[in-house]
């Protein structure tokens, strides 16, 4: 799947999921989905992961724009035979843009996935984390074992 199409798909799914939560839940409302293990809990996150740096929206917007530019530049210079690296960048870009839109529209990020033992997060956060994991995995592999197309 082309890089920008995947990033846009991640962005669209993220924004649709947040729209569904915003229109069907009140802030701080929680719905058990799988017993006491998994809930849908609508929260406003004005900070970063774990609520760090709350209410620093301008900082987050600036950093996110810079990260998006770096991702696009990295993609431009990435060899075409590195599909897993391309996947990682698309996931990170789509997730970063999803949270950026929230910050620009609302001044906070909409979070709703609640595992009860971890801070509440969203699909954009998941895309970013999976993208970073794939990126690290690919960069740490010996050159001959990296996910290159034959």
From Swiss-Prot:
One of its GO terms (molecular function) is aspartic-type endopeptidase activity. The chain crosses the membrane at residues 59-79, 84-101, 117-137. It is a multi-pass membrane protein. One of its GO terms (biological process) is proteolysis. Its EC number is 3.4.23.36. It comes from the Bacteria. The keyword Transcription does not apply. The keyword Cell membrane applies. Pathway: Protein modification; lipoprotein biosynthesis (signal peptide cleavage). PROSITE patterns: SPASE_II. The active site is at 111, 125. It holds the Pfam family Peptidase_A8. Signal peptide: none annotated. It catalyses: Release of signal peptides from bacterial membrane prolipoproteins. Hydrolyzes -Xaa-Yaa-Zaa-|-(S,diacylglyceryl)Cys-, in which Xaa is hydrophobic (preferably Leu), and Yaa (Ala or Ser) and Zaa (Gly or Ala) have small, neutral side chains. Keywords: Aspartyl protease, Cell membrane, Hydrolase, Membrane, Protease, Transmembrane, Transmembrane helix. InterPro entries: Peptidase_A8. One of its GO terms (cellular component) is plasma membrane. It is found in: Cell membrane. Its main location: membrane. Belongs to the peptidase A8 family. HAMAP family: LspA. This protein specifically catalyzes the removal of signal peptides from prolipoproteins. This is Lipoprotein signal peptidase.
């Amino acid at each position: 799947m082309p890089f920008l199409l995947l990033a846009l798909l991640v962005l669209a799914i993220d924004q649709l999921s947040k729209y569904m939560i915003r229109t069907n839940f009140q802030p701080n409302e929680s719905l058990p989905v799988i017993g006491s293990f998994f809930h849908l809990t609508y929260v406003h996150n004005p900070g970063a992961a774990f609520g760090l740096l709350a209410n620093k929206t301008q900082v987050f917007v600036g950093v996110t724009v810079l990260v998006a530019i770096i991702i696009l530049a990295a993609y431009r210079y990435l060899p075409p035979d590195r599909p897993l690296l391309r996947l990682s960048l698309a996931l990170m870009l789509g997730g970063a843009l999803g949270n950026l839109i929230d910050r620009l529209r609302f001044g906070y990020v909409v979070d709703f996935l609640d595992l009860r033992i971890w801070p509440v997060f969203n699909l954009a956060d998941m895309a970013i984390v999976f993208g970073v994991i794939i990126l690290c995995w690919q960069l740490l592999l010996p050159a001959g074992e990296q996910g290159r197309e034959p």
